[in-house]
């Protein structure tokens, strides 16, 4: 199977290319924090030679509680993204939740993301596809990897073949997620070689069954990320925060920003090693 290349500006995303880091913060908490987080990612990825795309949400539309922080909204969020692009020269990935958001967001962001909970909403999928933007599809927690081929087909039927697939874990009973490492290969197969990336921090979520916010297992982020990259994938999707214990969303799953360089350094070493191996055909 030939691996497809999806281009994000000058970044070539493919399963057999050096991994791309899609990293940032969960939600835009403030303009100043976004600048701080982006600056650190740029510093680390430039130093280590890792291709980089900044990620954050302008609206967390699927929060569990009506009282939870959602973000600054689309208009203010796009202004922050524009400033980040102008200041640091980064590419941007962010998610959309409504059809009306697709066009204006695609005019600023380099990649628009289809949220896991909305990945089967055909009208939204078609609206995103028709922008012509690169689309990152989050695999729903309730969907098997093989079913991702149907979502890819919807996008391609609209004339857009710039698709990236992302695993963020699968439901394992109530309020828990696990990652099936065989699923990455299945998604590659059903998409005919599309780039597949791994959202390691969201995969560490562990809900309180009676609470209004997600817990997490950030103490295991390194081992889970290593496992994902060992399969041979196109990229890693990561959230970091200067103060995870006081983050406004998903702090328990976020990597402390202070250890970002050590983390990315390990991931690059592992990715380089895995992709130095010759491909073996074990299907015969």
From Swiss-Prot:
One of its GO terms (molecular function) is 3-deoxy-8-phosphooctulonate synthase activity. It is found in: Cytoplasm. GO terms for biological process: keto-3-deoxy-D-manno-octulosonic acid biosynthetic process. Pathway: Carbohydrate biosynthesis; 3-deoxy-D-manno-octulosonate biosynthesis; 3-deoxy-D-manno-octulosonate from D-ribulose 5-phosphate: step 2/3; Bacterial outer membrane biogenesis; lipopolysaccharide biosynthesis. It catalyses: D-arabinose 5-phosphate + phosphoenolpyruvate + H2O = 3-deoxy-alpha-D-manno-2-octulosonate-8-phosphate + phosphate. GO terms for cellular component: cytoplasm. Keywords: Cytoplasm, Lipopolysaccharide biosynthesis, Transferase. It is an enzyme of class 2 (transferase). InterPro entries: Aldolase_TIM, DAHP1/KDSA, KDO8P_synthase. Belongs to the KdsA family. NCBIfam families: KDO8P_synth, PRK05198.1, PRK12457.1. HAMAP family: KDO8P_synth. This is 2-dehydro-3-deoxyphosphooctonate aldolase. It comes from Mannheimia succiniciproducens (strain KCTC 0769BP / MBEL55E). The lineage of its organism: Bacteria, Pseudomonadati, Pseudomonadota, Gammaproteobacteria, Pasteurellales. The gene is kdsA.
